[in-house]
From Swiss-Prot:
Pfam families: NDK. It comes from the Bacteria. It catalyses: a 2'-deoxyribonucleoside 5'-diphosphate + ATP = a 2'-deoxyribonucleoside 5'-triphosphate + ADP; a ribonucleoside 5'-diphosphate + ATP = a ribonucleoside 5'-triphosphate + ADP. Major role in the synthesis of nucleoside triphosphates other than ATP. The ATP gamma phosphate is transferred to the NDP beta phosphate via a ping-pong mechanism, using a phosphorylated active-site intermediate. This is Nucleoside diphosphate kinase. The active site is at residue 117. HAMAP family: NDP_kinase.
Amino acid sequence: MAVERTFSMIKPEGVRRGLVGAILARLEQKGYRIVALKMLRLTPEMAAAHYAEHRDKPFYQDLINHITSGPVVAMVLEGPGVIAGLRRLMGATNPQEAAPGTIRGDFALETSDNVIHGADSPASAEREIALYFTPAELG
């Protein structure tokens, strides 16, 4: 299986609830290497760029308001099959449907506060990594 890179973000409620360490531990225990990591607070412009594909959806403004409500932890992960593997480890978007043992199944409280984001495709991973990290930050 090819080594890939993907983008992931611990959302504001994950930071607020003190889950950063537990989530990072799960990612590393899975064998994923953290290539780059930073804590930041998204501006509305950064959030709009991140959620550009949802711009015309009725929930768009709620996404923007939520993701800018507090600091996030943005990261780049690397490993064989990391894009699909991270999606499995995160669990279903709706925490009520997420299996126990997944990050959302164990930590998320509701769909709007589902603790973690992960790129859903190689193209999304590339786009999102470029939004948050410079080539120099990626080593």
